[in-house]
């Protein structure tokens, strides 16, 4: 899966308690602890089981369509006049994003554990669609919790999930977004621990989820590294990805962490600006706290109450971030920067116009940062960006904003 990291490696975490430095861990209700420990034990076995890995690889090839291509964005590179820009085309995967990589891995684990019901949370709907897809593929019932706000703004994905046989439950609590959906899913899990598997979509949650999701997503960076060596004979100077919970980002970052020549940048949702509360930049404007089973950077007020964030992109609309990202930020191995809604929207239009690729609003945030950085870099330098999802789900949102 991932080659074994060397000692003193940035890739060695988490420790046996699921911690990356002071982040991560397992902050869960007592009723869930036996289940979490059971999950960890099964995950350790599966990781080292050649049959599990072979099935995962086969489904990756024949069902997801891996490896995803590495694409040189020739016209975008020419327009910006600086570094060469490459995209890892995760939006070409089955279901249209990176989410399927993790879902296939986790459903194989659920089957292994004898679970007969799948639950999931979703923001943009991409993880919900991927969960409903793998549940259909393996003949298991699936319930997807989705914030009522997101149900409204991601209608095409809601329809897809229902077509795939999933039950979509709109969550009206809080601001009706991803955080609230995750709270409801955790409640369901506590109630139905015996037969239910909670398929978490991002690299957050209690240990072993952040590690497990990362390992299933690391196929992105592992492939990209190989493809980059084939295309350019060397590694990129900069690897960049959008960060909500952070699974697409950790998937492309992780295999490069020990390559000191490679700069790593995660792009957070700056929303309408960092002055107010209408953003989801947990690292840039948040502070460490505990949410959804792990310690990490969160958007919280002085009393530790979780704030309701905002982003034009439903998939980045989460008031926290995966614990490994928090650790990478604190040790200085990765840098995290915000991009505003309007910048992401401009980047979305630029890519569509120049390359004939309609990106999701999530990777449009990463693209906006690429557009800022590329002109300041030399023409002999290389940027690798994770194009984590396609924009079919966002065309109505964008059309509304642009008055089309």
Swiss-Prot record:
A GO MF label: tryptophan synthase activity
Cofactor (UniProt): pyridoxal 5'-phosphate
The EC number(s) this enzyme carries: 4.2.1.20
Residues modified to N6-(pyridoxal phosphate)lysine: 99
Keyword Amino-acid biosynthesis on entry: yes
GO CC annotation terms, alphabetical: cytoplasm
Coiled-coil annotated residue ranges, if any: none
Reaction equation(s) it catalyzes: (1S,2R)-1-C-(indol-3-yl)glycerol 3-phosphate + L-serine = D-glyceraldehyde 3-phosphate + L-tryptophan + H2O
InterPro entries: Trp_synth_b_CS, Trp_synth_beta, Trp_synth_beta/beta-like, TrpB-like_PALP, TrpB-like_PALP_sf
Keyword list, A-Z: Amino-acid biosynthesis, Aromatic amino acid biosynthesis, Lyase, Pyridoxal phosphate, Tryptophan biosynthesis
Pathway it works in: Amino-acid biosynthesis; L-tryptophan biosynthesis; L-tryptophan from chorismate: step 5/5
Family: Belongs to the TrpB family.
Biological role: The beta subunit is responsible for the synthesis of L-tryptophan from indole and L-serine.
Subunit structure: Tetramer of two alpha and two beta chains.
Name used for this protein in its record: Tryptophan synthase beta chain
Organism: Rhizobium rhizogenes (strain K84 / ATCC BAA-868) (Agrobacterium radiobacter)
């Amino acid at each position: 899966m991932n080659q074994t990291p060397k000692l003193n490696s940035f890739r060695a975490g988490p420790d046996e308690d699921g911690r990356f430095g002071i982040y991560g861990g397992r902050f869960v209700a007592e009723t869930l602890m036996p289940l979490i420990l059971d999950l960890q034990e099964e995950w350790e076995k599966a990781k080292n089981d050649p049959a599990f890995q072979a099935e995962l690889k086969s489904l990756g090839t024949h069902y997801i369509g891996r490896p995803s291509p590495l694409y040189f964005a020739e016209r975008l590179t020419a327009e910006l006049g600086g570094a060469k820009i490459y995209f890892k085309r995760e939006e070409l995967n089955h279901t249209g994003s990176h989410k399927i990589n993790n879902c296939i891995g986790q459903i194989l684990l659920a089957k292994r554990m004898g679970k007969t019901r799948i639950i999931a949370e979703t923001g943009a709907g991409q993880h919900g669609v991927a969960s409903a897809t793998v549940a259909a593929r393996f003949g298991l019932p699936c319930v997807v919790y989705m914030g009522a706000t997101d149900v409204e703004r991601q209608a095409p994905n809601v329809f897809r999930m229902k077509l795939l046989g999933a039950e979509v439950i709109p969550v009206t609590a809080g601001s009706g977004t991803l955080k609230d959906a995750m709270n409801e899913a955790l409640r369901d899990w506590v109630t139905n621990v015996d037969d239910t598997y909670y398929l978490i979509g991002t690299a957050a949650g209690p240990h072993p989820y952040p590690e497990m999701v990362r390992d299933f997503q690391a196929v992105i960076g592992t492939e990209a590294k190989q493809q980059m060596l084939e295309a350019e004979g060397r590694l990129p100077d900069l690897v960049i990805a959008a960060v909500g919970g952070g699974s697409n980002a950790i998937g492309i970052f992780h295999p490069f962490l020990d390559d000191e020549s490679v700069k790593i940048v995660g792009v957070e949702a700056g929303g309408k600006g960092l002055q107010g509360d209408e953003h989801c930049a947990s690292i840039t404007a948040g502070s460490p706290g505990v949410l959804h089973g792990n310690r990490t950077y969160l958007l919280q007020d002085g009393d530790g109450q979780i704030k309701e964030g905002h982003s034009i992109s439903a998939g980045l609309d989460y008031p926290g971030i995966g614990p490994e990202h928090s650790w990478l930020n604190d040790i200085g191995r990765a840098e995290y920067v915000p991009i505003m809604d309007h910048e992401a929207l401009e980047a979305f239009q630029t890519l569509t116009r120049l390359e004939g690729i309609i990106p999701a609003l999530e990777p449009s945030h990463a693209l906006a940062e690429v557009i800022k950085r590329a002109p300041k870099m030399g023409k002999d330098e290389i940027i690798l960006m994770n194009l984590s999802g396609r924009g079919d789900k966002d065309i109505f949102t964008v059309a509304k904003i642009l008055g089309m």
